[in-house]
Regions:
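Ankyrin repeat start-site detector
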Residues: 8-9, 41-42, 74-76, 106-108, ...
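Ankyrin repeat domain, specifically the short helix-to-loop turn at the C-terminus of the second helix
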Residues: 28-34, 60-67, 93-100, 125-133, ...
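Conserved ankyrin/ankyrin-like repeat signature
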Residues: 25, 57-58, 90-91, 122-123, ...
Length: 268
């Protein structure tokens, strides 16, 4: 297999130490003069590998010795993207402290979408707190919320909604609620409706979310129950939350309001 031979011959001891978290070996190689930014034919750096392996100590050492924080592979992967693949909050935090770009040069490898897809809630939370565009709509993926719903990552969907993600923004005409209905997730559907999802929205096939579930199923019955108008309390909550835009959770928490009212606004 020529391809695998090329891959192996392109592999350096520096990459090997980084992916496996061998800090002592990494230090020795760097001290002996190895290039911290040595890349493979695919432009994969030791920092990419350290983050992919979730090895924060190795990533920290590489960054201190001049590793490029925004290096891009031929697949458009940045170290930040690699950290979102592994779900390493420690690596993610390090990269952000060293000036990593939240938004990649190409939508083929979006960190927030990757974190949402894999269910890495803490990564989603950290990216959100640093100001990532949580409604970033990638043509072939949709929004982070849509990706979370498509992959049945309830906790990530909740975190995005709490942070002010647009509940109706999905992939083209397909809404997050359509994705939740397709996966027959009662929990996701209830969550989205609670945050004001439009149950009447039609996708490219002119189908509403409820038309994507088997009639008579628990989810089908839930949609029938929710067909009526929202209560005045729900409408007020949605209106107030919209006023705060992104980072709603932090802003509402800081309001001088009774705790019970805060809990209601926060969907606690």
């Amino acid at each position: 297999d020529t391809k695998s031979t090329d891959f192996v011959s392109d592999w350096s001891p520096l990459h090997d130490a980084s992916i496996h978290g061998r800090l002592l070996a990494l230090k020795k190689l760097i001290n002996q003069g190895s290039d911290v930014n040595l890349v493979t034919a695919d432009h994969v750096s030791p920092l990419h590998e350290a983050c992919l392996g979730g090895h924060a100590a190795c990533a920290s050492f590489l960054l201190k010795h001049g590793a490029k924080v925004n290096g891009v592979t031929v697949d458009w992967h940045t170290p930040l993207f690699s950290a979102c693949v592994s779900g390493s909050v420690a690596c993610l935090n390090l990269l952000l402290q060293h000036g990593a770009n939240l938004h990649p040069p190409c939508d083929l490898a979006s960190p927030i979408h990757e974190a949402a897809k894999r269910g890495h809630v803490e990564c989603v939370e950290l990216l959100t707190s640093h100001g990532v565009n949580i409604d970033h709509n990638v043509k072939h993926l949709g929004t982070p919320l849509y990706v979370a719903c498509e992959n049945q990552q309830v906790d990530c969907a909740r975190k995005l909604l709490e942070s002010g993600a647009n509940v109706n923004s999905g992939k083209g005409l397909e809404s997050p609620l359509h994705a939740a209905a397709r996966s027959c997730s009662v929990e996701l559907v209830m969550l989205l409706i609670d945050f004001g999802a439009d149950i009447w929205a039609k996708n490219a096939e002119s189908k509403r979310p409820m038309e994507l579930v088997p009639p008579g199923s628990p989810l089908g019955r839930l949609f029938l129950q929710k067909e009526g108008p929202l209560s005045l309390m729900q409408l007020c909550r949605l209106c107030i939350r919209r006023c705060f835009g992104h980072k709603q959770h932090q802003k509402i928490t800081g309001l001088l309001l009774p705790e019970e009212l805060k809990h209601f606004l926060l969907h606690v």
